[in-house]
């Protein structure tokens, strides 16, 4: 069955062009690995995931929030039911419904007892809280409840300190109905218990007022140099436990006891009526289960046993690096399972990095049994960090195949490696289908090429076979001649240090990202090379079809420089043509996709391409970093397929909407000031256009156009009495502006 998300991404034009581009997130192209169809092939990958639950769509069941701290990306997998069977389905645009201020961590839990899970995330030096104020009528909505949580540290009301690297336990520790917090002291040795005073003061749960109840909760200490846990510790503050206690200051530490990082999961593992904890440490791959010897909360009970090989009844947790555990039911059996993922950005496993332990016990007495080390990832295109897609018919069967390179994948022995995966198109001209053939194409990872190997494809010797020009970390290029027969792919030994027409080694300095493309439209492949520093170099082919000679013609093509907050940009170019017009989609390390036109007459030194959009399709938040693109009509329907690479190691797939026409609308119009009020709207909405009239399209949340209006310059009053409560997108066609409007008519 053809499956797709008919969801329009509306291009927010930054420069007031008369333009409209629409793409659909689309998961209809099947992808196979070892003869198994992937469930979420185009979900984009995951690296350092964190897991929570929320009823995202207000349908009465819990959906899965997956937050990745790589670049604070949010994914939502909605729980669906077909034929009585529950399963997850990715909602690719759900990230738009979460606060932009989310950083480093996300914990979703209902703190005020209204039945809707709220969000706890990072605030400067501590915790920020967003209250869920949504409903089935208006959808998911958030209100900032606390910019920063504070706690009473024995008379001093200070910010409740949680390091940005840590994941605290935010849970009802004493089972009184309000949410408490367990977090490590800044020294990293002692677990502090901050009790929520909402029930004690007001008899309800909707306040966030904390008091440091115990400076050494559980009576244990973690060694500052290892992750060894000392139970029944006899040093201050563990000897006295409950505050007040002068033995340790609330937010200070000695020079040799700087906190590096800890993760805490609190759960009543053995059903004893008190919280046990599972602890991870920044420098280690295991997690330690501590069993609480108490039988009632708030009795200063001690941890009486530890399991550093947890879960010792199954395959122990061993994931590099800095594991964090999450207690979530992900197989819909009513029992919460254990998910474990690394929490150390850029130095942890990033390809098979989510372990699932199935709970074969009960909800009250858990028993965790190892099931997989790639939960969700095993059903995605997933290649570590910094994926980049390439479409080319490598085997001359008339179907474009898919190659995916990466910046790096974690490797325990040598830390990291870069490689290219080959997905053969095993479908048809009208129904593409990709099958993973080789996750390390021609064994490139064994050749010590460094990070971020970047291929370009083209027939450089006019023999009818696609050759490869490979960009390396050291800035040079490597040539692979295609000597394939009809039955198999064979490439000649690599030619290192590929040269230009003068015999000089072509070099981008560092991290060359080449593209072979006939830029000047003379029938011969030219060479464009991205440089780490953010520019593009243009080498014109002054040779022949069979003997190319690349001459450096413009060292700063299009006057482009994508370095933004840092000196580096890592540009990844993708030039393409539609209706004989050349366009450029340019990826970069900042995660933005820049869309350029006016290219064909601007190849000379000093000429600039026209930047049509600095954040193409507004995808940067979902991409996070290391954006890249490949565009082609894969299924012969005259609609462009867009594949998007990103830092989480997977791909997005979108398909061009039939009502869009890339690049033909170029009329520049004056900047338009648009006012919409009141918001939220009630039974009417006033729209004021400052300069000119406009055409208005109104869409609902699932991308259906429900109304089309002509607006005049000046004031326009819209009657909304027949609108249902909810969120609508108001798209002003002439000015390319989109507004999100909440409507509440009752």
Q: PLM features: what roles do these ranges have?
A:
Residues 1-24, 664-665, 704, 727-729, ...:
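Bacterial Sec-dependent N-terminal signal peptides
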Residues 2-3, 116, 452, 465, ...:
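Basic side chains
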Residues 5-11, 61, 181, 524, ...:
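Acidic/proline-rich low-complexity IDRs
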Residues 6-7, 333, 362, 428, ...:
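Short amphipathic alpha-helical "recognition" segments used for binding
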Residues 20-664:
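Beta-propeller-forming repeat regions
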Residues 667-746:
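C-terminal outer-membrane/trafficking sorting elements
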